[in-house]
Amino acid sequence: MSPRALVIKVTVGQEDAERCSQGFTVAATAAAAGAEVTLWLTGDATWFGTPGKAEGFRLEHAAALSELRDQVLELGKIKVCTQCAKRRGITQEDLLPGIEISGASSFVAEILTDNTQSLVY
């Protein structure tokens, strides 16, 4: 039996730092535990797929967002919402290597797969 898949969507950025950090923390922890993790960055979280943005994120008593992002990228997948990227002028070339732009149909296909749990932060 393959490991259970976990799809996490983070919809906020620095404006709701605690919720944002929780999403990244759960994604990195699940990936380290062996789950098949896909982290979706939507809304203002989209910026964290670009170089330098996660490095500037600060939240007291929380792991560095850039380290959590890198762990998820190493052990799982990170996708950025197509519409969210377009609204912010972000192209595939602007994203870190390994992060891809993908649309709602891809997100829905992932969360409707058997043995998959989805969480939204």
At which residue positions do the language-model features occur?
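Residues at the starts of beta-strands that form the adenosine-phosphate
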Residues: 5, 36-38, 77
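Short, glycine-rich nucleotide/cofactor-binding loops
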Residues: 7-21, 52-53
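Short, conserved beta-strand edge motifs with alternating hydrophobic and charged residues
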Residues: 8-9, 38-42
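Histidine-anchored nucleotide/phosphate-binding helix
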Residues: 20-35, 39
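N-terminal beta-loop-helix "entrance" segment that forms/cooperates
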Residues: 45-59
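A glycine-rich helix N-cap at a beta->alpha junction
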Residues: 55-85
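A short aromatic-anchored loop/beta-hairpin motif
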Residues: 79, 88, 92-95, 101-109
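Aromatic- and Gly/Pro-rich donor/ligand-binding loops
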Residues: 119-121
